[in-house]
Amino acid sequence: AQAKADWAHVANRHFADTAYLQVAGEPWVGVFGPIELETPAEWAEVAPAGRVHAIWGEAAEVGPEAGEFAWVWGGGGVDHVAAVAAFSQAAPGRTGVAYPGFKDYYAQGGWGDGLGWEIAHDAGQTFSTLLDVAATSPDLAALQIATWNDFGEGTMVEPTHEFGFTYLTALQDFTGVAYGLPE
């Protein structure tokens, strides 16, 4: 019952807002999991079919019409760029991802033993490469920039002392906006 009430609240308060992301005329709703609702039957009671996008590999828990979005992953010896490219080009309507790198901060931050893997920033090349993957994946519904300002995980796009405006200027180049760093 709470999930239904939460969905109704978000739908009534945010979906009609012109600033809310729409994909193919529908509000885009991402679920980092799912964690609480884990079957298509549970999701069918909460959200209209096709409205929910689960993190990659979890869409079956939401239902056959669920969308998917890619996320930062580099564990198990996975080539993260190849994984993002394969996901982004496998089926239309998916949401791709670009991120600057990843730092396994969990043990240092006091959250267990950590993940045991990291993705190098390579002076901005990781982010640029993933933007290139998105540019060559014409059937993506959207591109998510992960995560904007997660300084612990090193996935920040916001300017820093270490990287300056590297990621923002790369994003400006990618989107083709008419302004640059001076503005």
Q: Residue ranges of each PLM-predicted region?
A:
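Glycan-processing catalytic domains of CAZymes
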Residues: A1-E183
